[in-house]
Design a protein with these regions (language model features):
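Beta-rich carbohydrate-recognition and catalytic domains
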Residues: 1-18, 23-70, 77-265, 270-297
Length: 297
């Protein structure tokens, strides 16, 4: 069974620090998340942290776009060796009511200097996480909010700016999605609120199964031994928790609960030095803070 080796708070300066991601780039750690006054309040900005060892963290950059609430930043490395950020960009009226959104992307050569957030796709889209494979970026865009029907469109891109439609995920309540690839080219999708999908090139036809548990903020990775490990928010008898799950292409089994509670989830996952490193956010210690956990599998 997985064992929690360590966990520590690495950031808590804003009233609400949430929606994390984690990556290794140029032999350093990089962690991103949203800073704001609250979970659903406008005015979010994106903070980029960096660390050489994962022990001491420092701020590398802050991304801001006037009048836009930047949300759910996710990191990837482009084929030409740059860091890429994909974010949701939401607009609110003067009373703070949600109006519309569109995805934003930003790029950096060094993690410190970033291009201005650039809008991609059309209004109502939200590219939630980008995964690169064989020189192309893939992402599922979620559409629809509130009482509107939700839809999920799979896109690909060669540059992260111009996106080509591939297929629609016709699932009830389809939302946040992480995509990964197996060595034979099969694509696997972990989809909120609780689906696992598989497809082979050209990724137009999909097979889905439902998971036993509902998943919020889904992420997963494939380890060198071929095993799949997932994470997300699990609603337990004691309230929401961030969990690590043993995963296959047809199952998702929570096996470890991280120290967490309340407003929590959205883990970044990296396999490094024979440990699973996980960034996540939680409000179990007062305030909503960013944490880094190391898990031995």
């Amino acid at each position: 069974m997985p064992q929690l080796e360590s966990v520590k708070k690495i950031w808590g300066h804003a009233p609400h620090n949430a929606f994390t991601d984690l990556i290794r780039f140029r032999e350093r750690w990089w962690c991103v998340f949203r800073e704001a006054e609250g979970h659903d309040l406008p005015g979010g900005t994106v903070r980029v942290l960096t660390s050489e060892t994962g022990v001491v963290w420092e701020s590398a950059a802050t991304l801001v776009e006037g009048g836009i609430d930047l949300r759910d930043p996710k990191l990837s490395v482009t084929p030409d060796g740059r860091l890429m950020l994909v974010m949701g960009g939401c607009i609110y009226d003067e009373d703070g009511e949600y109006l519309i959104r569109a995805p934003r992307v930003s790029f950096s050569e060094d993690g410190h200097a970033w291009s201005a957030p650039r809008r991609v796709l059309s209004e109502d889209h939200w590219l939630w996480r980008v995964t690169w494979h064989d020189g192309r970026a893939y992402s599922l865009s979620k559409l629809g909010e509130g009482d509107e029907p939700r839809r999920g469109f799979l896109y690909s891109s060669v540059d992260g700016i111009e996106w080509d439609w591939i297929a629609e995920f016709k699932l009830d309540g389809v939302s946040e999605t992480t995509l990964r690839f197996l060595p034979d080219g099969e694509m696997v999708a972990l989809v909120r609120p609780g689906y696992i999908g598989t497809s082979r090139p050209p990724y137009r036809e999909w097979s889905f199964c439902e998971t036993a548990d509902r998943i919020g903020g889904p992420n997963f990775i494939r380890l060198p031994d071929g095993s799949l490990w997932g994470s997300g928010r699990l609603f337990t008898a004691d309230g929401p928790r961030t969990v690590l799950a043993r995963m296959t292409t047809s199952s998702y089994e929570p096996v470890l609960t991280l120290p967490s509670g309340g407003d929590t989830s959205y883990a970044g996952m990296v396999w490094h030095d024979d440990l699973l490193w996980m960034s996540y956010y939680s409000s179990h210690e007062g305030g909503t803070n960013v944490y880094l956990a190391k898990v031995r599998l």
